[in-house]
């Protein structure tokens, strides 16, 4: 039947990944024939609705060479146990569509020519990008006259050079020394004689087309791994360009140094067109790399290629908010519009509009201070005089004031300098109006200054690079530094969201613009981190910025096509915004587009992983072949030689197996991801199109059929499809899907568990027990799979303990004890009666109040132990009572009120101290055997150390202190009787100290200028003075050490106390050296 073909393809795909998937397909193929008449919902749709894929169209546009290319095939008697080589190619044509087309692919085969016995491709001299040139809006119109109407030839500025080429090993000995230039559009490895070139649309698993018939026949039956840079042969040591091209082809997103070295290599050889080509290829992979755009623009500017330079500006300025890029643009505009010859004012107008455009896009950056300063200086250089009365003067004044007021509100490095310039500008025009403007702008300036300080503190270690790197795997090199950069960027984003500039209420648009700007800056460095793209899009959607949010998602998917997070978010947005679409087929096609792109990227990763596995295995085998074999001695036996050979072979096999196991883990994770992508698509199509109708609407069943055709899926897809059929439609097809999945995944414990749950949900207990016995028996037969049976046993044990027979429960527990002897029996028994949130077998009721008696609090955190401990060096003082009045002990009677411990009186005589020492020794001897179990009453105070007790016994009593004592009552009364003046003018001063403050005052031999007010000189030494200022502030002048001492005396005197109470004291210390 039709379903057999699909299942057969699935079996063959699963057999190639048996190591990572963990199932056996031997008896599944036989079961397929016996159950061919069973119903499967996907079998009714697979013929009418083939799996959609963009790459399927490539087979229609292949050249005759690729069409006639022999395809590798599998024999029908493949290993049924799943022991096939992990790197075998898929045997179905559907899997070929999963490989994405390289970015440099073209639809027309290039023309070839033969040079020196080598087949090479002609270079493409066309430059299609120049024809669509549009000048920037702010550039002068007069510049259009010098732009050529025809595209500039690709090699116009390229000097003749002799680049290196790539050769095979056979060609290294026989080929001529003549080199041929590489293509300027794509790096093509030259093939020698019987080596065919791989078609750009060809699947990665297809073998290369050969020119010799016998080699073509061999490639039809063998499964060679495709050539790769790591294993490609024939690169000459001095072929620097070819080696770098190989590195880029192998890892275009991860090997950034190879890109940079290749650009430098071309530029050092004066191959400008080749350098341009590498720049273009690099910027397709990293389109937000402002550093490389700046380098590209700088190269064109140095070559005086102004037309190409303007093209770069048109492509980047409005999409890449980078201060460096806008600086290059402003330099170009000022270069093209000289002010020295500007008689009409048109050049100044163009430059001014360019500055306005730049500040509109990057003026909020904390590194934009130089552009603000240049803009202000540009305005100052304009016609008119600041402070003049003409219309040009007034216009210039208004422009400067507006520019300053905009600049001082931005938290940037130059904000302090610009504020000082603005202060001088306003005060130089009119002090009265200047104070008014400064007072109005001061809050904004203070907020910007404090915000910049705070921002600079936590971004000090931030690396604002625009050359993104792939996230290192945890535990790999650079993972800590990468996580640190992510944390700093997130702190900056959250800081902007917190609205430190208080813009949300006054200017909501500016607040949103600042947050989006920081997101764009972060994404330049964290381009390959999907979480940041998701957060940026989500912020835009929550703030009514639908266009910006969709743009973030689109660019994020371009950067991370294998990200499930971004693809799912994009699909959700399309599903929500397309609710008005009445045609479910059109709506489903629109929603399915992100899923298809994600699946293509994931299948491509699986293909690359398998290719990498084959390369690693081939490299290991080549390494063992190149090892020199030790020559056995003449008296060695053949048995020793054979044992040594076997040992080497076992070592090689062990290393190869380790490599394959490592790759199988990665492929298994990728297969899991592919499966959940199919599940998400299946659920989305169910919401939009339902389960589908044959010949009308595909629905979720068609997605299930597509997933089975493309392969590389786990049991999760079968589980999800079956549960959708059951929960949404109550369709009997759910049981059929579970039955088919049980044959495909006989050792998958998760699938068996879900199958059991489904059978119990439909009340098919007999089949549930049968499935349980079959699964457990099969898993327990292999000791390595015994642990997989534990969740299955636990589930059925829980069901039987609630709804089954006690004999069944006991039998299950007996089998569980045999399989898991380390598990405690108590837990198995308690599992019968417990729930996830309560276990009655562990409940201990409170029977007596003594069970709830509070714990005894011991001083110092010491808790008495059950076993005796060595006695401390000093006995506890709580049992050391004064011989004068013994301390009463009511510990035995808990009902009587507790008394506070009375402080011990000092022991005056020597006899009393002797009695105390004898009492301590007696108590110490009695406490030794029972010191650990001694009971102390609750809440007793901590004992005093022996040294403190001794000190209290030797100090004199309080009656012997005859000196003067401080009286707090008299001090408070003195403060109450103070006559505080209402103002400064009411302070009585000596007539001799009054003056007009017009001269100088000598204090301690030093001269102080009189700036208004009165002086009061204190002390005979004349070393300090209290200056009463006209503005109501006390200023205390001091001179030298004596002046400082006298200032403190005066400060706490009557006048100083008055100044302290008024809180208006200023201490003025001119730091005059002491005389």
Swiss-Prot record:
Keywords in alphabetical order: Cytoplasm, mRNA processing, Nucleus, Repeat
Keyword Nucleus included in the entry's annotation: yes
Gene Ontology terms, MF aspect: mRNA binding
Biased composition (Polar residues): 54-72, 93-112, 868-883, 925-940
Listed Acidic residues bias regions: 120-133
Record-level GO BP terms: mRNA 3'-end processing; RNA 3'-end processing
UniProt repeat feature HAT, residue ranges: 270-302, 304-335, 346-381, 395-428, 465-498, 510-542
SUPFAM superfamilies from the UniProt entry: TPR-like
Cellular component, GO annotation: cytoplasm; nucleus
Renumbered residue ranges of the record's region Disordered: 20-185, 215-237, 621-653, 840-941
InterPro entries in UniProt: HAT, Rna14-like, Suf, TPR-like_helical_dom_sf
Biased composition, class Basic and acidic residues, residue ranges: 885-896
Principal location: nucleus
PANTHER family assigned to the protein according to its UniProt record, in alphabetical order: CLEAVAGE STIMULATION FACTOR SUBUNIT 3 (PTHR19980:SF0), RNA CLEAVAGE STIMULATION FACTOR (PTHR19980)
Protein name (record): mRNA 3'-end-processing protein rna14
Organism: Emericella nidulans (strain FGSC A4 / ATCC 38163 / CBS 112.46 / NRRL 194 / M139)
Higher taxonomy: Eukaryota, Fungi, Dikarya, Ascomycota, Pezizomycotina
């Amino acid at each position: 039947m039709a379903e057999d073909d699909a299942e057969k393809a699935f079996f063959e795909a699963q057999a190639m990944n048996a190591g990572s998937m963990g199932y056996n397909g031997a008896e599944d193929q036989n079961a397929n024939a016996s159950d061919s008449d069973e119903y499967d919902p996907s079998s009714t749709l697979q013929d009418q609705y083939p799996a959609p894929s963009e790459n399927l169209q490539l087979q229609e546009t292949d050249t005759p060479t690729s069409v006639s290319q022999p395809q590798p095939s599998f024999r029908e008697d493949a290993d049924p146990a799943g022991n096939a080589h992990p790197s075998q190619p898929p045997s179905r044509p559907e899997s070929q569509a999963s490989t994405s087309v390289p970015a440099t692919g073209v639809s027309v085969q290039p023309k070839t020519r033969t040079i020196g016995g080598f087949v090479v491709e002609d270079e493409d001299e066309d430059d299609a990008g120049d024809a669509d040139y549009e000048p920037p809006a702010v550039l002068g119109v007069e510049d259009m006259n010098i732009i050529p109407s025809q595209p500039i030839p690709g090699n116009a500025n390229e000097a003749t050079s002799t680049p290196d080429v790539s050769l095979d090993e056979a060609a290294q000995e026989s080929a001529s020394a003549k080199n041929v230039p590489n293509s300027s559009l794509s790096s093509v490895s030259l093939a020698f004689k019987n080596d065919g070139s791989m078609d750009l649309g060809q699947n990665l698993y297809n073998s290369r087309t050969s020119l010799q018939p016998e080699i073509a026949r061999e490639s039809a039956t063998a499964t060679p791994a495709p050539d790769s840079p790591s294993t490609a042969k024939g690169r000459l040591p001095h072929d620097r360009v070819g080696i770098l091209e190989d590195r880029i082809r192998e890892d275009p997103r991860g090997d950034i140094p190879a890109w940079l070295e290749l650009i430098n290599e071309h530029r050092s050889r004066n191959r400008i067109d080749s350098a341009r080509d590498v720049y273009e290829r690099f910027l397709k992979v990293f389109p937000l790399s402002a550093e490389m755009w700046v380098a590209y623009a700088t190269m064109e500017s140095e070559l005086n290629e102004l037309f190409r330079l303007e093209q770069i500006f048109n492509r980047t300025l409005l999409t890449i908010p980078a201060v460096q890029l806008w600086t290059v643009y402003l330099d170009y505009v000022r270069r093209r519009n000289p002010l020295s010859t500007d008689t009409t004012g048109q050049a100044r107008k163009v430059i001014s509009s360019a500055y306005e455009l730049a500040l509109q896009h990057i003026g909020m950056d904390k590194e934009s201070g130089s552009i603000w300063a240049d803009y202000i200086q540009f305005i100052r250089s304009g016609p008119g005089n600041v402070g003049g009365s003409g219309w040009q003067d007034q216009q210039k004044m208004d422009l400067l004031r507006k520019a300053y007021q905009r600049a001082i509100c931005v938290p940037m490095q130059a904000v302090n300098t610009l504020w000082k310039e603005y202060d001088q500008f306003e005060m130089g025009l009119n002090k009265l109006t200047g104070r008014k403007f400064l007072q109005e702008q001061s809050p904004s300036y203070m907020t910007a200054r404090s915000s910049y300080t705070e921002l600079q503190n936590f971004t000090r270690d931030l690396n604002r690079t625009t050359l993104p790197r792939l996230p290192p795997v945890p535990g790999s090199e650079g993972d800590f530094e990468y996580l640190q950069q992510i944390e700093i960027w997130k702190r900056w984003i959250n800081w902007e969201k917190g609205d430190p500039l208080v813009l949300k209420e006054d200017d909501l648009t500016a607040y949103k613009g600042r947050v989006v700007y920081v997101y764009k800056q972060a994404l330049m460095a964290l381009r390959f981190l999907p979480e940041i793209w998701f957060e940026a899009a989500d912020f835009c959607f929550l703030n009514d910025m639908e266009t910006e949010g969709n743009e973030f998602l689109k660019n994020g998917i371009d950067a991370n096509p294998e990200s499930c997070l971004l693809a799912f978010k994009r699909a959700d947005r399309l599903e929500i915004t397309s609710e008005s679409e009445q045609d479910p087929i059109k709506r489903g096609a629109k929603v399915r587009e992100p899923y298809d792109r994600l699946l293509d990227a994931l299948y491509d990763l699986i293909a690359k992983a398998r290719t990498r596995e084959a390369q690693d295995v081939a490299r290991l085998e080549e390494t063992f072949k190149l090892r020199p074999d030790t020559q056995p001695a003449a008296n060695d036996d053949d048995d020793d030689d054979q044992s040594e050979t076997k040992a080497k072979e076992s070592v090689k096999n062990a290393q190869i197996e380790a490599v394959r196991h490592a790759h199988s883990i990665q492929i298994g994770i990728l297969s899991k991801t592919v499966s959940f992508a199919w599940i998400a698509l299946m659920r989305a199509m169910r919401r939009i199109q339902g389960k589908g109708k044959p010949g009308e609407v595909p629905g979720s069943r068609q997605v299930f059929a597509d997933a089975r055709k493309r392969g590389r899926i786990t049991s999760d897809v079968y589980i999800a499809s079956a549960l959708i059929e059951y929960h949404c439609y109550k369709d009997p097809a759910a049981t059929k899907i579970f039955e088919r999945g049980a044959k495909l995944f006989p050792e998958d414990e998760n699938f068996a568990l879900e199958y059991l749950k489904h059978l119990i949900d439909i009340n098919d207990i007999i089949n549930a027990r049968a499935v349980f016995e079959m699964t457990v028996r099969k898993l327990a037969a292999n000791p390595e799979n015994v642990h997989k049976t534990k969740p299955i046993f636990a589930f059925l044990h829980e069901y039987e303990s609630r709804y089954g027979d006690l004999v069944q429960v006991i039998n299950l527990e007996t089998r569980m004890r045999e399989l898991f002897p380390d598990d405690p029996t108590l837990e198995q028994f308690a599992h019968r009666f417990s729930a996830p949130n309560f276990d009655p077998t562990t409940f201990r009721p409170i029977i007596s109040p003594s069970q709830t008696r509070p714990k005894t609090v011991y001083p110092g955190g010491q808790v008495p132990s059950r076993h005796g401990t060595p006695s401390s060096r000093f006995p506890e003082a709580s049992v050391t009572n004064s011989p004068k009045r013994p301390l009463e002990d009511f510990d035995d009677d808990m009902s009587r009120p507790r008394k506070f411990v009375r402080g011990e009186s000092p022991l005056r005589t020597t006899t009393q101290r002797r009695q105390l020492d004898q009492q301590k020794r007696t108590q110490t001897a009695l406490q030794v055997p029972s010191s650990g179990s001694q009971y102390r009453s609750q809440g007793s105070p901590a004992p005093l150390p022996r040294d403190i007790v001794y000190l209290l016994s030797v100090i004199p009593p309080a009656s012997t202190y005859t000196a003067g004592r401080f009286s707090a009552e008299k001090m408070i009364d003195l403060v109450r009787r103070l006559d505080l003046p209402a103002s400064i003018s009411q302070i009585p001063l000596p007539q001799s100290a009054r003056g007009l403050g017009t001269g100088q005052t000598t204090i301690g031999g030093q001269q102080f200028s009189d700036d208004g007010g009165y002086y009061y000189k204190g002390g005979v030494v004349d070393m300090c003075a209290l200056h009463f200022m006209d503005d109501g502030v006390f200023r205390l002048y001091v001179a030298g050490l004596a002046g400082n001492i006298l200032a403190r005396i005066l400060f706490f005197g009557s006048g100083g106390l008055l100044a302290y109470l008024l809180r208006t004291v200023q201490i003025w210390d001119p730091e005059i050296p002491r005389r």
